[in-house]
Every structure is written in structure tokens, then in C-alpha cells.
Amino acid sequence: MPRRGPALGDPTDFSYRINKITKIVDGDTIDVLLDMGFDIKYQSRVRLFGIDTPESRTRNKEEKVRGLISKEYLKQALKKAKKLTIKTHKGSETGKFGRILGEIFADGVNLNLKMCTEGYAVQYYGQNKSLVEAEHMKNKSKLIKKGVLKK
């Protein structure tokens, strides 16, 4: 039996073409129109899987600024892309609020990962809030150094 290598993908993953972004809710949530094939479209809210961005709708002004910066970064990345796809994983297709959980690919680049490496998001898999906040503070410093965020 042939071994499955990383280039062959996981048969439990599903990929869909994003026909249209209808709304960017915040840095880790978007509304999309998915192309399901056979001329079938599906409207849904998507939570970017495995990441967390600062809240853009909060009373904490400093966090809100960082949240809006993350939202704008995502908006620009999506806007520039010629081809957008979403990849979901069997067993974790939806989150606790019924949203699709997915990795967004813009022209083949995983935006979930890119947002983390660039300092606009942190990896999130349900860990302690204080650990997540500590990572957000590291990103804050990173964005200040880049000149994206003022002290």
C-alpha cells in the first residue's frame, strides 16, 4: 500500500472556493459566499481556524485599535488575492457558535499562519486566556517595532 506523503493531503480535509467575501467582521471572522460546485452557492460566517485576533468591538480602546489593525490587514490580504479558498478539517468543521472553522488561502498562501507570523494574530486552540493575552502583548511589541502601531 502506498504511503501518503504531505504533498498528497489529508483525505479528511475539504476545500471550497470562496466566490465572494460579503463582510469582514473582524480579524478572525468573515462572511463568505462559497462555491460548492455544480452552480451551488452557500452563504456562511467563517471563523479563521486556530487563531485569535484582538477584539475590534470592545470598550478597551487600546485593544480595539489593535483589533482594527488586524481586521484591515486581513481585508487587504483578501482584496489583493486572485484566488481564495477555504480548507476545513473533518471533525472540526464548525465551532461552538455554529460558524465554519477554516483556514483561508489567498493565492495559495495560508492567511491564518501569515497573520500569526506577521504579528496580527496569535495561535489559538482553546488555551488559557492569560496565555493568549501574553501572546497578544508580544504581538503588540512586534507591531510597534514595525511601525504599524504607535506606543
Question: What is the meaning of each model-derived region?
Answer:
Residues 1-151:
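Small beta-barrel nucleic-acid-binding modules, primarily SNase/OB-fold domains
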